[in-house]
Amino acid sequence: EILGVLGIARDMTDTKKLEQQIRNSEKLASVGKLAAGVAHEINNPLGGILNCLYNMRKGTLSPSRQEEYLASMEDGLRRVQRIVRQLLDFSQQHNPELALADINQVVNRVLLLTDHLFVPHRVQLETALSPDIPELMIDRHMMEQVLMNLVLNAIQAMRTGGVLTIRTSMDEAHCLVRIQDSGCGISSSVLPRIFDPFFTTKPAGQGTGLGLSVSYGIVKDHGGEIRLESEEGVGTTFIITLPGQVQAA
């Protein structure tokens, strides 16, 4: 016999707004980490362009040499343009929007923005991106944020340099993205808390403790999962599993 019915309704609007604000603040934190290096990356081609202009103004260059200088200047400007566009696109706030996207292109966009960090941190990059992955139904901007956070964390974990390996592959109906570093590793005692909000193993002032929590939420929103394998003194591997999306013929 049914004696009554209890109904509970919760307005999740404020919660969703807070989640979005946290994601945006974490994205801005990543942009801050990138800014100085991106400025250096832009300054190099600009210096080359100024040098070309200086030599061309002398009026002593042969026509063929002038063409070489003009081509070099154009290449430098296009590189600056590409970097600025990528950074602006990454930093802007976007409404969540699922669409078919190439996960390998998402990986490469993140690597383009972080490329300038590898040499000064003595990090060797290795990639193995499978060409057999179908386009996935994802929010490209959110997945860029997840991968950006994991790449930046990996670089920070390799204090004396090391190898960063990024792999993509298919496992039956799922896409796997692996981000592996040869850094300091994570103690087994803190592994259960690694995705908790505000938990960080970094020194005070060097991390918000939100990056992995935000990444966890984004991957979950995509119907996927994120886990890690780590051993102190050996390194850490983050494994993202996303539902495969096969396009209709």
Give the residues covered by each predicted segment.
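Short loop/turn elements at sensory-signaling interfaces that couple input to output
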Residues: 1-5
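Sensory beta-strand/linker motifs that couple input domains to effectors
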Residues: 8
